[in-house]
Amino acid sequence: MMTTKRTAIRRRLAVGRAPNGPPWRGRKRGHEAIVAPLAATLAATAAVGLGVVLARAGRDRRAARAQLARVRQFAMLPGEGLATGLERIGLGQLDLAIEMLATEDGQTLSESAVHEARKALKRLRALIRLLEDELGGQVFARENAVLREAGRRLSAARDAEVIVATLEDLMRRHPGELAHRRGVVRLHAALRAERERVVQQSLADGSTAADALDELRGVRRRAMAWSLSDRPGIEAVEPALKRLYGRGRRRYRRAALGSGSRTLALHAWRKRVKELRYAAEMLDRADLDDRDGARASRTPHGLTPVRAGGKLVRRGRKRRRKQARRRREALYIRRVARRADELGELLGAEHDLAVLAGRVRSQADPAGAPVAGRGTRRALLRLIAKRRRRLRRQALREGKRLYRRGPKRFAARVRSASAAASRG
């Protein structure tokens, strides 16, 4: 009897310990059976928590980028006054230039960073020229000189890049006349070698960027003390805007008459055109939709078909036409900016060709060795002159459209457009 009971107990224990026996039959939960589900739960909770943290971090980064882009928007924001907007634009462009030029110890600047910094400096010079009356002549002269010198420090690499790109563009336009000439190939190779040398030297020279950076930080500190009057509309900058436009108009007339050096006249005109472009971009409203001016209606004559009482009636003619006129008027500043941008591109291409022509005439690489024979030089200069004549004709035609008004009428039109944009 005792043996039978012991045998039965052993059998039950064996069933409880059997790995393939019925689940938990005759046994209690072990340590592993408790820890494993708990560990899985904790791991899942940690993964969810980490996912939430990463999602929040990504959202915060996107929000920060959006806020930074908004602060650095080179235009008036919705509901923003002129003084507030120009102060934001000035500080935003200064911060952008400083950020592009600031590097860690031992690091070199990138070409794209230098390019963005130079663009910001050009915009800043246009801004303080627009604020000349507000800042005063002494402050304007000081800051303009500082910004001009900072831009000059960064210009060597860009100038070397432009002359290579100009020759390559000419080669693409006239492959049949230039591709087979060894002198053109040698000139191209010499200019590319010079570009690489200048770019590497400029980017590796930390003192150049450091000096420009110190100057810009000084401007940034002084800019915090600028006091701009919050007068309605564009009243605060209207005198400067008329002067800026008038200078460009006079330069256009000199270039059209062809008196003196045509190359110098066109280059001086180009500077005034770029100032006008940046001024118009700053005064433009970022929230305006380019399509608004064309949305008079989807039916002829700006009428809206409305079915009422079983008949087709047309309503809203005057209201819709008035809205369309106001939208077109509000977009006038943007049209000026775009025309000035296109004109500046034409004048810039003409000037780049003039620089290339000077290099071709010198018939030597930077080391003084001749790179092109007489026939190659004649062919290049002939094609350059032909291209320059075409660009000049286009530029003068566009300039006539852009500068057809007098300074007073132009400023009045900008004032009206700014008011229309503010009304929405």
In which residue ranges do the predicted regions lie?
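Function-determining surface determinants
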Residues: 3-295, 306-424
